Amino acid sequence: MKKIITLLILTYLPLSAQSPSYYNSVQQLMGNDLKNELHDIIKEHNEFSYTSTKNILKLADQDPENENNVILIYKGLSISKEDFASNNQQDFWNREHVWVKSQGGFNGDETYGALGAYSDAHNLKPCDASINSARGTKDFDIGGSPNSEATGCNFTATTWEPRDEVKGDVARIIFYMDARYKGDSGEPNLTVVESINNSSDPLMGRLSTLLEWNEQDPVDAFERRRNQTIFNWQQNRNPFIDYPEFANLIWGNNTLSSIIFDVVELSNIN
């Protein structure tokens, strides 16, 4: 990936030395204006059945050191791609909806395959089946008791804290889901909020914690490769992986005097 580093003043955001640019239309935007424009950029994507997402994740979350394995999001272990928990077998993997499907009303039919938010691969991660159940419908926040099976993960009755190595990954997935799903054409209207224990409302917290995680755990090569792999299938990207700074410009401290962007070269962009 070619990188072009440009120092930008927030009153003007020239995002590109490339033309055309995937993000060209977000220049000079902040707050809800920026989020709404990102929504327009990423809202049209190829949809796949839920069954198909298993194959997408086998590529997107492939262990860089073992092409036969995937990396589990909360445990951090590398296990065989073929150890899929079709019947919730212990120590096998299944698909974790990082934005909980019940907190968005996008439960789908796993037998026949559901489209849209339910099968959006950006929101799905390989996860140990028992840990997926332990996380359940909990919001994200810090603190609680250690999970005995997933080292580095903590939990309370209402919150889940992932291991440090994927805190930023989780935050950027949640930010993507908020920007992507705004209630268009019967889709869920998802909103990241400061509150927790939001029941079945299409809300996910805790916003302030997720903003901290976005900064504490920067984007790495694994996350960038995953974003590109999913783009190859869905033809939409997670903007918060390409530009983590977007999160603060929308929800956080947008008074910074300057930010740095890596300009992403994309194939198949017209």
Functional labels for PLM-detected ranges:
Residues P14-L15, D109:
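Hydrophobic alpha-helical membrane context
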Residues L15-Q18, L266:
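Intrinsically disordered, low-complexity segments enriched in Ser/Pro/Gly/Ala and basic residues
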Residues A17-I79, F246-I260:
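N-terminal module-boundary/linker segments of secreted carbohydrate-active enzymes
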